[in-house]
Amino acid sequence: MGQEVRYRVRGGHALHGTAFIQGAKNAVLPMIGAALLASKGRTVLRNVPVIEDVRRALELAEYVGAKVEFHEAERTIVIDATGLNDPNRAVLPASIASRFRGSVLFIPALMHRMGRARIEGVGGCNLGSRNLDFHYRGFARLGAEVTEDPERKHINVKADNLKGGRLYLDTPSHTGTENLIMAAALTPGTTVIEHAALEPEVLDVIEFLGSMGAKISGGGTGFIKVEGVSELTAVEHTVMPDRIDTGVFAMMTAATGGDVSLVGANLDHLGVARWKLEQMGVQFTQQGAVLRVRRDPNVPLRPINAVTSPFPGFATDLQPPLMALATLAEGESYIREAIFDGRFALADELNKMGAKIEVEGNRAIVHGPSELHGTKVTAHDLRCGAGAIMAGLVAKGETIVSPAYQVDRGHSHFATRLSALGADVVREEVS
């Protein structure tokens, strides 16, 4: 029998103190892919989150021929991609890609450096009908030849005759926007991306690529223009703070009635989530690079209505922890998931703990307040796992959340950081 890695949470402890917010997962992953576009120099990325998705990305980078150093204690990555020239290594193997959805972010580098790419599987969070077709349609619009085998075992991309073109995203996906910008950066001619994402992470990736020599304009407007250049050069860059990490810690502080200072957090990056949390009774104070979050435990949380939408709207990645927080509010909360279907997996787990949540299609009705009780729950995906741990912080008794891997994909040293704030959280291996 193999080892199970899980989180064990004992509730009843308010969070107090100081926590450091990690670098942004959704910025560093495309930056690792973009670093492979550099034919000169060594890329240095700082403020890198020590998470499983970063480790998978670096495994892929090494697999295709890059030299990689991950200095975890310093949260720094060094990537030398000057040796990416063997077309036989232009493969993203299922052994890694099936566990790591961000593997699609490596296709632009393989297209430009090796002339082709093959992806044998995609992984990450299981979110309903979410798929990657729009990435491949974008590559094809730039002149790539994209073919899929009959049994969907892998996808082949050939890039012999790339040229700039006009691209349109049906939904303003941050991953899709970043990927198409990377594909366009070394493609001859002018590429225009309409309905592009506005997320802060996209702007950080654009800044990174611009430092490398890419010619990109229109970031933050939804209409991005890329003038192809002949080469990109490696640079040093500090990754922005993770706004989802910020939101999760803010909600955990609110749930426990705590008072926490989040170092490196940026309140503006929360978008609508900031206003929704304030409506519930959460207080924010930004002083320089420190965001103070507090909630009076003697004042009940107010119920909320929230609809997920692209930035600056309410982030879909914060919807599961918001659901957990809403179980504590006095009254009915209504949450509509407008980005991904199948993202209410946490509802069943919270109901096991004593919550009263009804799911009707893409809408959840949370009847609060509920007294939560610890039990064994499943982390169906990364954000579901974070929401379950959050519920465990306020539940009576002990909550077991597994597999830990899902949470580890997106939150670095989660148990350590929570324990430093007074929580009783342990990440453990059991037979």
Curated annotation (Swiss-Prot):
Keyword hit for Transmembrane: no
Catalytic activity: phosphoenolpyruvate + UDP-N-acetyl-alpha-D-glucosamine = UDP-N-acetyl-3-O-(1-carboxyvinyl)-alpha-D-glucosamine + phosphate
Residues annotated as transmembrane: none
GO CC annotation, single: cytoplasm
Known EC number: 2.5.1.7
Pathway field: Cell wall biogenesis; peptidoglycan biosynthesis
Annotated Pfam families: EPSP_synthase (PF00275)
Catalytic site positions: 125
GO biological process, one term: UDP-N-acetylgalactosamine biosynthetic process
Top-level taxon of the source organism: Bacteria
Enzyme class: transferase
Residue positions binding UDP-N-acetyl-alpha-D-glucosamine: 101, 317, 339
UniProt keyword list: Cell cycle, Cell division, Cell shape, Cell wall biogenesis/degradation, Cytoplasm, Peptidoglycan synthesis, Pyruvate, Transferase
Single GO MF annotation: UDP-N-acetylglucosamine 1-carboxyvinyltransferase activity
Sequence positions that bind phosphoenolpyruvate: 25-26
Transferase as UniProt keyword: yes
Record PTM 2-(S-cysteinyl)pyruvic acid O-phosphothioketal, positions in chain: 125
Subcellular location, principal: cytoplasm
Localization of this protein: Cytoplasm
PANTHER family: UDP-N-ACETYLGLUCOSAMINE 1-CARBOXYVINYLTRANSFERASE
Described function: Cell wall formation. Adds enolpyruvyl to UDP-N-acetylglucosamine.
Family indicated by similarity: Belongs to the EPSP synthase family. MurA subfamily.
Protein known as: UDP-N-acetylglucosamine 1-carboxyvinyltransferase
Native organism: Thermobifida fusca (strain YX)
Lineage of producing organism: Bacteria, Bacillati, Actinomycetota, Actinomycetes, Streptosporangiales
Gene label: murA
